[in-house]
Amino acid sequence: MQPFTTHTGLAVMIDSTNIDTDQIIPKQFLSKVTRDGFGVHLFHDWRYLDDAGDVPNPEFSLNQPRYKGASILVSQENFGCGSSREHAPWALADFGLRAIIAPSFADIFYGNSINNGLLPVALTHAQVRQLMDEVAAEEGAQITVDLTSCKVISPSGAEFSFTLAESARHKLLNGLDAIGLTLSHAAQISQYETQIQGWRS
């Protein structure tokens, strides 16, 4: 998993509340079990005017030329609600997004994002609105997300602090998923297993 320390990237916004996981990645695209290849289906029903995904919707923000290559998504409250599917953060990450900024997130989506290297940043409604206004006002507007200091820097230079559980912050800073976190304690695990063998003999 790629470590997340500080990232500056082009920002895109979807000014909608209660974006659920079926909107993020519709159920008909969930047959794959590997993490790659989901980005093309991200927000399928909004990005495309046809079921096959051949006709892009020019009104949808992710299809607009000014947002091409965006790596930070700004959205509204309760992002990632709905059914639990790890495919949702997979699709967002595969599309090229590194961080999602919103006033609140669904709990399961929040945890799945952290476990897959996607940083969910919760800011106040007013701060999110300011970010959206600045992104809309300036083509090419970039946002910086600094996980080392837990700050978001807006295109105009305004700084907003956010919080993240230290365990989640540690995993993201070091690029550790659940397996990687376990392997980081390999020496202690080996020592414990040796002790267990001694007790059993």
Curated annotation (Swiss-Prot):
Catalytic activity: (2R,3S)-3-isopropylmalate = (2S)-2-isopropylmalate
Top EC category: lyase
Domain of life: Bacteria
Keyword flag Disulfide bond: no
Pathway: Amino-acid biosynthesis; L-leucine biosynthesis; L-leucine from 3-methyl-2-oxobutanoate: step 2/4
Cytoplasm recorded as keyword: no
Annotated EC: 4.2.1.33
UniProt keyword annotations, A-Z: Amino-acid biosynthesis, Branched-chain amino acid biosynthesis, Leucine biosynthesis, Lyase
Gene Ontology MF term list: 3-isopropylmalate dehydratase activity
Matches recorded under InterPro entries: 3-IsopropMal_deHydase_ssu, Aconitase/3IPM_dehydase_swvl, AconitaseA/IPMdHydase_ssu_swvl, IPMI_Swivel, LeuD
GO biological process: L-leucine biosynthetic process
Function: Catalyzes the isomerization between 2-isopropylmalate and 3-isopropylmalate, via the formation of 2-isopropylmaleate.
Family as reported in the entry's similarity comment: Belongs to the LeuD family. LeuD type 1 subfamily.
Matches recorded under PANTHER family: 3-ISOPROPYLMALATE DEHYDRATASE SMALL SUBUNIT, 3-ISOPROPYLMALATE DEHYDRATASE SMALL SUBUNIT 2-RELATED-RELATED
Subunit relationships: Heterodimer of LeuC and LeuD.
Protein name from the UniProt record: 3-isopropylmalate dehydratase small subunit
Native organism: Shewanella sp. (strain W3-18-1)
Lineage per the UniProt record: Bacteria, Pseudomonadati, Pseudomonadota, Gammaproteobacteria, Alteromonadales
